[in-house]
Amino acid sequence: MHLAGTRVFIVEDEALILDTLQDMLEALGCHVVASAVRVDEALTKLVSLDFDVAVLDVNVAGTRIDPVADLLAGRGMPFLFASGYGRGSLPMAHRERVLLTKPYRTADLRAALHSVLPQ
Amino acid sequence: MAKPAADTARKGHSAAVYLIAFAVAVTLPLLLLVGALLYRSVTLENEQNKQRIGQVLQALVADLDRDMDRRIAVLETLSTSPLLVAEDWPAFYAQAKQGLGSRAYLVLVAADGRQVINTYVPYGEAPKMTGDPASLQKMKQDPRPVISDLFTSLVVRKPVYNISIPVMRGNELRYVMSLGLLPEDLRDLLQGQSLPPNWTAAIWDGNGVTMARTHDQERLLGTAVPKHLTELKPQTVVRTTNIDGQEALIAVARGHWSNWTVDVSFPATLVDRQLNDSLLFWGATILLVGGSVVGLALLFGRTLTRPLAAATAAAGALGRGEPFAIRDSPIREINAVNDALRRARHDLDEGSAALRDNEERLRTAAEAAQFGAHEYDVVRDRTHRSPQFLKILGADDADATATFEAGLDFVHPDDRDMTRRAKQRILQRPEDRYQLEYRICRRDGQIRWVMDRGQVIRDKAGAALRVIGVVLDITDIKEAEQRQRLLFDELNHRVKNTLAIVQALALQTLQTRPKPDEFADAFSDRLGSLARAHSLLTEDSWRGASLQDIVATALSAFKDEGRSIDIGGDAVMVPAGATVTLSLMLHELATNAAKYGALSVAEGRLAVRWTAVPSAANIMVDLHWEEDGGPPVSPPTRKSFGSRLLASSARQLGAELDLDFAASGLRCRLRFPVPRPGP
């Protein structure tokens, strides 16, 4: 299982979902290095954070995720979206990224992570 | 509509012209016939005159000859007298004088020209020589009766003429016996013919000297007639100048005995006057008939054209929708036209009244429906817009008409190409109806959505002639649609988010309550809490809920059981997302209190109190959960679902959470910001 040890950064405002996602990732052997419940918090944490992949909610407590996605894309970091909104709600520049539609299963999460992480 | 050519009214001729032409066509042959008849009667008259001249001439000649025959017979009777043979001159003189009477006298001339007897004068007084030597000379050559020319008698001393016969003795001429006659006898003979007035008969002798005339005998006796008259061919009526130099119809003839000429003439002025009279009569007839015909034609034409002109004017007024009055005409056909016009006016009035009513209703309906109408004339490339359409466009009357391309000026630039293509396609494709939606830019800069529906009207060949359509401002509908779509998107998101929360609740509950019956109870409780939070939010359209309501709802089940629960604080609104989170937190605290804390025993007390203090950026809520009178409290030995939820939820709310597991009862303090209410 080569997801083992994968370092994950989560941006998700909904507490229960954040907890559950964290549980799922840990069940997959990933290590959640940090999480953010707001966009500004995420941007602050990203400055010094080291991780392999990010899972991003789209609408974070009323603020769009766009600046975070742009920053990650600029760095060439792999990331995926997890959102209750459809693909149409994704940032225009990131429409073709992997989208995990809520609610999702652990298997869905694993497949999504596999598809964004380098082989 | 093309204006009918005004020239048409000037085409053709007035009915009066046709009536005149008709009258002329009818009367002209009649007039020509009258003319021909008149001419015929004139020529016939002329012919008759000529014939009459001939007849009179013949009668005169015959009379003259008879007269001479009689005179010659008298002379011949005398020549056989024994007294002549015996040359008993005094007795013969007496016999002759007695036999002849007063109008004639006898002259007996010997062959040598010596007068023997002259009864004009007393016996023995006769002139010595004959006054008519010409007759003697003729008789010497040819012993036949001779009628002399006029000569002046030696005894009468007036012009006379002689009728002479030879008196022969054997083959020798012995005497010439002449009857001396006065020209008056000839005049009487001429006058005895009782010629019509103005006719003239005349006799001239072989020398062309007038011997007798019916008129002017005294004046012209013995004068020579003009040479051209003497040269006239006998028995032919010619027109020439008479002895007085006047135009006349003249015929001449010669007698059997004499070389005299008898002439009958009558003035050409008579003939001419007849001709002139006829011509005058004909001309007068033409003038009278022609004048009355033309006058009547004009009169009838007026009775025809006047009501026609009135009907024409009425038809014009009818066309312009103006009132008109027409009177009855004596002509039935025109009355029929008038009736038709009146009926048409009546029908039009009724029709236009109905049309006005209809139009009024349609306009009211269109205004009520706020429909703008437009009509596009394909052939002339012209669009007409109704006032309501102009109102929709925010335009004025100057924009009431436009070409196809100019008509697109109002279309929003982003929609213009699409609209142009669609409208061009509408004109070409076989379907007749269309419906388009596009945005327009009003004159005042507002952008509005319109729906444009219409129909194409085609000719028989299928080519588009006109497009008639209505335009409705659907901006409100469009905005409502957009709001609805947003709402659906939002709802979809919330449902999915809620499902995600439910999933999380299930997974989290399963970790601490793996036994099915325990899981079911705990999960159901939490679901119920979630449902009540949603109910609260639905009451205020998901804008949020008051903190009072959130707390009361979360604890309502325990309050209903009669537990001592004290709730109160400042009025403050919590946003939707925070409401759910806060509800779940309060639910976990209450569940914990009901299992292990103040709510697990009858004498336990719970107080939930808060303050809300506005700051520059938001409102800070400071909430205290305080339990008393319950069993002794001890901190949890392992991290439970509740404590994990409280911690992560507090983080979500941006809250500071203080949990104090005091022995007297659990103390929980939660400080979190909520946004200031909007204006």
Please give the residue ranges for each predicted region.
Chain A
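Two-component/phosphorelay signaling modules centered on CheY-like receiver
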Residues: A15-A34
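Active-site residues of response regulator receiver
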Residues: D57
